[in-house]
Every structure is written in C-alpha cells, then in structure tokens.
Amino acid sequence: MIRGLHYMCWYRQDWNYHPSMPMKRLQQVQDIVNMNGNLLLWSCLGSAAIGIQYLDKEANEAIPPRLRFYGYLNDKEFIAECGKRGITASAVIWKAQLWEFPAEFSEDESELLALNKLRGVGKKGWIGMRELSTDRYPKIFPSIKTFFPKGLKDSDGKPVKDFLKGFMAVTLDGNPIFSRWLMVPGHDHYCYSPCGNKPVFREYLRKEIEIMIDAGAPVVHIDEFDAQLLAAMSGGCFCKDCLKLFREYLKKNPSAETDDLDLDRFDYRAFLKKKGYTDKDLTDPDMDKRLAIPLLPAFIRFHIASIEPGVIDIAEHVRAYSLKKTGKRAKVTANLYHCDPHGEAVRKHCDLIIGEKADIKLRQDGYYRFGHAFFGGKEGSFIEDPGPYIHEIMRDIDAGKNDSYILFMLEPLAHGFNIAIPYGGWLQNQRQDSFYPPAEAERRMGAWLKEHESLFTNRFAAKTAVLYDQRSAMDCELTKGLNRRHLDVGFPVFHGLCQSLCDARMLYNVLYVSPDEPLTAKRLAAYKQIVLPDAYSLPESEVRMLRAWQKKGGRVVSVGKVDPRLADTEFRHRAFPELSAHLAQVGSIVAAQDVEGLGLSLHKRGRGYALHLVNYRMNSGTRVIETIPRAEFTLGWKPKKAAVHSFPASDTKARLEGNVLTVENLSIYTVVELG
C-alpha cells in the first residue's frame, strides 16, 4: 500500500513560501518511518523557479556545523537518507512559477544579509529569475554560464539574456500573468507565470531535470502541468510562440469562424485588438461573456492541446537522462489536481497518479469511487487542497480531538483512493500556518494499516457501474466548468449521482471511459446495470457494444443529458434519491439496513470478501464520531466466518446467521473479514 505524505514541511505558524521547501532534518526522515510512509509528494528540489543556481545550492550546498548539529541535510543527502529507508522522495517542477524576492546585501554585494524576510539592513535589491540569469550578483552565485555555457536562444534564434522576460506568459495587452494564488498576502514578492509553449523555457526545464537526477531524485513531479490553461484563464498567452502555434492549430481544426481568415498570416492578438477587446474582456468573471469572444473557445482548446506535448517533453527527458546517468528510469508524475477531464491526456505519461483533492468535506465517498477509476489501475496518492473543512480538522487536532482527522485519512482507502498524510502541508496562505498530523494517532494508524494491508485489495464487488464519459465531461468542462474546477468541473449529474448512491449504501463501481481507456465487452460483462449520467459523446462502436450487452439482459439507464442514440434508456427523476431507488431494483451483493451515517464498500479477497464500514456520525458539538450501535446486512452468499478489525480499537462485534450479518458498536472504521 502506498502511504503518501504531503511533505512540504512548511513551518508551523508561518506562511508557505514557494518555491523552495524548508531544509530537511534527519528527525523528519525518522518521522516518515514512524508513520509507515513510503512516498513523499512535493518534497524537495523546487527552487529552479527562483533560478538554476539556487536549485544547485539547494541540492548540493555544504551545511554549516551549527545546522549539522541538528541533523540538517541538503536535498541530495535527504533523498539518499530516504532511499536507505525505502522511502521515495519526489523532486518538483513548478510549471507556473517564475519568482522575484526582495533581498538585502552588504555594500559590496558579496554577502546576502536577508532574503524574502527582510531585516532592514544593508543594501536593498532583488533575487530571482532575472537577477540570476543576468549574473547580477557574481560574488554570491555562480555564473549562469556554468549551467548554460552557450546561453539560451528563443525560437527565432535570438539570445535570451533575461530569463524572466524571455520565459513569461503575456496577456492580450502585453502584461505579465501572475500566479497570484501562490503569493503571500502583504508580501512584496512576485510570482510570474511562464509560457510552456516557449522552446527556450522547455530547454531551461531540461537542465533543471538534470540537476534533480544528478541529486538522486527517483521521481520528478510536475506541478501545474496545465499552466497553459491557467494562462488562458488569465487572459493569455499571446507570446509570439503561442500565436505561431495557434495559427497551426486553426489550420488543423478549421471552423466556420476561420473560413474568411488568412491562416498563413493570422495574428490572433491583432485580430482581437482590432475588434476592441482588452485584458478586461478576456478575464471577465462571466464565463459566458468570455466564451462569446471570437475564437476564444478555440484558443482555450489550443492551450489545452498544448499541455500534453509539454509533459511528454519533460517525461522523455527525465527517463532518458536518468537511464543514462543511473541505469534506471526515474518516475514521472504530475499534479492531476481534482481528476479534471483535461488531465486525461497526461494520465498515460505518469507512472503514478498524483493530484490535489479539492473541496474536502466530512463525507465524499462518491468522489473517491470516481477517483479510484481515474487511477486506471495505477498506484497514487492525492494531497488535500486547503479549505474550510481542513481548517476545522486542524482546530480539532489543536484541541486534542482526532476523530475528524482519522476519518479524513481512512475514508478514501475504503474506496481505493489515497489521501497523503499532511506533513507541513500547504494552506494556500489562507492562514499563517501549515497542516501537520496528530503524530501519535498517525503512528498507530500507519501500524494498523500495515498490519491489515491484505484487507485493502481495491478489487470491488458490485452489480452496477456508473459510466464516466470523459469526452462528455471534457465538453462540460470547456462550456460550463472552467470556473468550477474545485467543485464538479461542470459535471454535476455524474458527481451528484455517485454521492447519492453512496448515501443509499448501494455498491457500484465507476467505469472510466476515454479515448485511452475505451469501453469493452469485457468491462461490461462484470455488471448487470450500467448508468449513463450526461454520457452523450460515446463513439458509435461503444454505443453498439452497449446495445449488444443490453440484448443479453443488461440494463442501461441514462440520466441528465441523454445521447439521442440511447433515448429509450432515459429515466427522468426529480431528485437523486428517486433515481437511487430506481437503480436499486437490480439488487446488490450486500443489502444494508437503513442506518444513518454509514458508508460501505466490498473488497474481493481470495475466496472471500472484506466489508469496509465507515462511520460518519460526527457530533458537531463534541467533535467526536459517535459509535453506531448496530447495523444489519443481507449478503448475497453465506460466509462461514466473520472477523472484525477496527480503528481505533474498539469492542466492535460481528455475528452471522446464514446470510445475515449483524455488526455492533461500530467505531470510525471497521473491516469485517468474511471467509
């Protein structure tokens, strides 16, 4: 079992300062061991977004004796110490970050007196991408020529001296685009967004990768893999490379809008400026107004289409360079965020599925079932995106109450998903602090999971499958979900149905269907019922496959926006509970008594099953999850025995009478092993 850690190690009661994570200590490595962790996310080697020289120091600098006394390590040493203990540390590429920080220097600029956090001493200046690329402080940092002896050139063959200017994305009006969500409130520093379509920036990333691999990084993680979409949502990017590539995109994807355009010389910036558009129009909060701008939907699609080539460029260099230098291929991951549809093209290039779960709530088993399908059979782990419920968990921990945290960590495992342990997890600078686990509770939970790992097979038993049509989801994201990325990405019928079925304690699986993961007869054969929520973009071959499966006795139920080719399968409902009741007619392998605040999943295990039961009965006053006195289940088979495993440890009991299972005194998390 992967036990990921959201391992940014930001300091408590301080802001989260990207892009360079704090220096690690040996005790922090031991903490990972104590919690049975084995995969560190966002853990080291992130500072190339300040400058390549800064990254080199982060990897290789000598540690002063005073810090050695407390076990401090440079990042190369940190990676090695993790490796000795079977722990995989990931280096991180920030694709949406170019930083400039205030600094203070001695008068002759031979000594750095302060950086980011100023002291009011010495001579003021800046350290960042501009200064390090132009050798502004040669007495402090090595020359940029050490890393790029021949310099860098843009796509026209012209030398790029100022990397900040040469890399940054620009708006319609020629302004820089800022990655403002990373900047600390009230701080005088700046985070610019680069353009991933610039060949010169990709060359810089390749050198960054080489330093990471030379430092021993076994995994290179791409954060902000979709920086081009982020730029498009901020009024860009209109650099010369994007304008060239957009012309080629329109040639390959013509439409009625392009019929009268000379695509050999078309300049989208000049086209919009001539029509009177400005940055204000391209960043209008009303998404419908934005999408009504001529060719803007195509421009957004172009930027999304450019994401995959950028990831391929990184992935190929990571694997080729690491194989050459170490004899082994380093792994590649990307922050696939909320399992958004536009991440589909990148999934296949990732060795592990890593992301950032948004909109964390007390209960979200519906999402986790979808997330398991998004994993596509690969292993992975998601960090938490900070929000109100995360802050509530932190308040509970501060008060010595850990039930909400335990539920937060265990609930996804019931459904084949994985949330990383927050170890100095970032809070998006919503408050001046970072997220750490309750240490003793986490150590006990890690030991319990290791002992009971065989009960988490992630092979789920169900008669019903909910089909996730990635093509339809992508269409919804582009037309109504671009400003709902942290919620339902414009696909509420699918996500609402999944949660409704979980609330009704109905077992089901999600069938993730996409160009890279097509629907097959073998996938359909495992089920008696297929539900199609807003699935209107399946290719004809897959519709025919559904019809053939239906003729053999399968039940197809379409809801939401229904494909005209499947109109006869539509079921109209006024509310999700009505739909859930209709779907329950096919029966279930496990029929649960109506018990408030109970979730379940059924893992196939050898010749038996493991029934996972999740208790959501959080008392809002005491912040304690109250015991469920009794729950009864009618099983579709007659087990010979039932063994109970609970966390936290409790007096939970189970008994069998034929095919009826009764469980008493359910703790937060209970697994009933049915043999």
Regions found by a protein language model. Name each.
Residues 23-53, 77, 215-219, 408-415, ...:
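Catalytic domains of carbohydrate-active enzymes, especially glycoside hydrolases
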Residues 14-33, 57-86, 199-206, 306-313, ...:
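Aromatic- and glycine-enriched glycan-recognition loops and surfaces
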Residues 8-14, 45-47, 94-98, 225-227, ...:
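Active-site beta-loop-alpha junctions enriched in small/polar residues
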Residues 31, 120-365, 370, 516:
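Polysaccharide-binding and catalytic clefts of secreted carbohydrate-active enzymes
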Residues 3-9, 40-42, 89-91, 220-222, ...:
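Hydrophobic faces of well-ordered beta-strands that scaffold small-molecule active sites
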Residues 5-24, 189-204, 392-401:
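Active-site mouth loops of central-metabolism enzymes
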Residues 279-284, 305-341, 347-349, 355-675:
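Carbohydrate-binding surfaces of carbohydrate-active enzymes
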Residues 29-76, 97-116, 227-242, 296, ...:
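Aromatic-lined carbohydrate-binding/catalytic grooves of carbohydrate-active enzymes
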